[in-house]
Amino acid sequence: MKTTIYRDERICHLKKYAENMPIYGIYKGKPYSHILKIDGFNKRQIVSCYNVIQGVSSDLLPMSLHKFAHHLNSSQILCYNFFRPMLTESGRATEKLVMLLEKYGIKIELGSECAFEYNDGAGDGTEFDFHINSGDVEVFFEIKYTEQGFGRANDDDKHQKKFEEIYKGNLLNEEKCLIEKPGYKDFIRDYQLYRNVIRITNKNKFLILLYPKANGVVHKQADTFIKDKINNRYKENVKALHWEDVISDKNCELCCKYFG
């Protein structure tokens, strides 16, 4: 399904979750029924009340909320709604999360440290929607919902400089996760994916791209990238998973809200 059609269908479904809001939120000067009004309100409180699903605690909601976290199709809040029930009060992995990862061939320990909006301090500004640290094992999550694809970069002096000074030397680590080192044009086209995949420096590091299969543009981009760019030895370390498969309870509130 084309991304724009998928996005329109999802927004049409999601707008009923803002029915209790007296006034729609504004985007580029226009009101939209799937956007929560935050002007004059505490954004974090509005997101907690209306975008975090009922029964899910807001206590671990990231301090660095995305600019559009008050949009009901926010992939950041979808990520939070999905993973928060699998964590303890202190943000550690429960048996439910351990079993989920095991289903996809990744073994983590009970009580592993987890974080939303994780930055590994590498200096390139990359943040992952969700991250698990389990001893030598690390799992990085990139979450998509109604986005138009994985992020591209502008072809400008800024990104040319970043490519030369930061990424060029890291795009082929000793383990050679990538089949070949990309050129600049290739790099900026799949900018977000390359920024993510350079974290896979050994067989204990995993990148999970989690998105709706029905989002055709995202699905094609992820599938093509893994097929054409990832070394066969690392195909199991870069996984494309679909929300439709990962959510086991099709009648749960999360599934009804986002995929109903």
Language model features with spans:
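Nuclease-adjacent, charged terminal/linker segments that flank catalytic cores
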Residues: 1-115
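Catalytic micro-motifs at enzyme active sites that drive phosphoryl/nucleotidyl and oxygen chemistry
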Residues: 68-69, 113-131, 197
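Short, well-structured alpha-helical interface segments that form or flank functional binding sites
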Residues: 73, 77, 81, 123-126, ...
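"Short basic amphipathic alpha-helical interaction patches in structured regions
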Residues: 97-101, 143-146, 153-159
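Short, solvent-exposed loop/turn segments at secondary-structure junctions
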Residues: 119-125, 144-148, 213-216
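Active-site beta-strand-loop-beta-strand hairpin of nuclease catalytic cores
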Residues: 131-140
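Acidic, metal/cofactor-coordinating or nucleic-acid-engaging core segments within structured domains
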Residues: 150-209
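Non-catalytic C-terminal interaction segments of nucleic acid-processing enzymes
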Residues: 194-197, 201, 206-260
